[in-house]
Regions:
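Accessory recognition modules or surfaces
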Residues: 1-19, 51-60, 77-79
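Glycine-rich adenosine-cofactor-binding loop
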Residues: 13-36
Length: 157
């Protein structure tokens, strides 16, 4: 999935590399914990304080999403999981030259792909990676998630 894309596209190993992860929902949590396990220095930019605190409890750095433009110059690798445009032209212009952006968010994604290209970044909209890499497992996870969501919904009534 995402880790495979990063390993294939980066010129350097993830070990010791600074990676900016946007969003810390279920996908962000899965990617973040794996990146950290591979030795990446992960900074999670999230809107909700609880998500930032959770990231910090797992050994990652937490940052306010509102500070994204100020954070950008420290990174050349970004993974986005937020399905709203957060990687705008002004933010992209502040990333290190030739940055790699892997956008996992559903269409239209969270990246201004045209602006990324103009800035000289490589931006990949990596949709449906679990289904492409491991379709049976992906189906099981989707089914389990839907069941959990239905249970939570019933419990809220």
């Amino acid at each position: 999935g995402c880790i495979g894309v990063l390993l294939a596209q980066r010129k350097r190993t993830l070990w010791g590399s600074a990676v900016l992860l946007l969003g810390f929902g279920p996908v962000g949590q899965a990617v973040g914990t794996r990146l950290a396990a591979l030795g990446a220095h992960v900074t999670v930019a999230a809107r909700r304080p609880a998500q930032r605190a959770q990231a910090e409890s797992l050994g990652m750095q937490g940052a306010e999403l509102a500070r994204l433009a100020r954070l950008a110059p420290a990174f050349d690798t970004v993974v986005n999981t937020i399905p709203a445009q957060v990687l705008t032209a002004p933010v992209l212009a502040r990333l290190r030259p030739g940055s790699l952006i892997v956008d996992l968010a559903s269409r239209p994604g969270g990246t201004d792909f045209d602006a990324a290209a103009r800035c000289g970044h490589k931006a990949i909209h990596a949709l449906s990676l679990p289904a492409a890499c491991a379709p049976e497992t992906a189906g099981e996870i989707v089914a389990r998630t839907v069941r959990e969501m239905l249970r939570e919904r019933e419990g809220a009534r």
